[in-house]
Amino acid sequence: MATAASADLDYVRTLGADTVLDYEKQRFDGSATRVDVVLDTIGADTQQRSLRMLKPGGILVSVVSPVPESTQKRYGIRAAYFYVGVTTARLNKIAELFDGGELHTDVGTVLPLEQARTTHEMLGGAPHKCGKIVLSVAA
């Protein structure tokens, strides 16, 4: 199960999701389906609603914030906080994977640094193309 905006539903299906919910029209926690694993990239209320979607013994992996031990016990789940520290070596490896075609991403919008405010508005829900939003820094 995955969630996406209306405009992105078909794209998310191409990534392999069997069930895709339109989060603009349907709350994911309204589904009767309980899941084994949640990857939380939002946090806050979304994380709380995700906890209720997990099967007993399920796992919540968060890239936003750790889940307190008391919360894990209350829901009968396990949780992991996943954080990748950025280093020059890691960035070089990522660049190598992109250059070799082993890793790719879909870039939807590229804007100059001077339009950083616009990118924040897009992240907050303003219309934009499907894919990553990139700020370009002049050399």
Where are these regions (language model features)?
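Terminal helix/beta-alpha structural elements that buttress the NAD(P)+-binding lobe
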Residues: 1-139
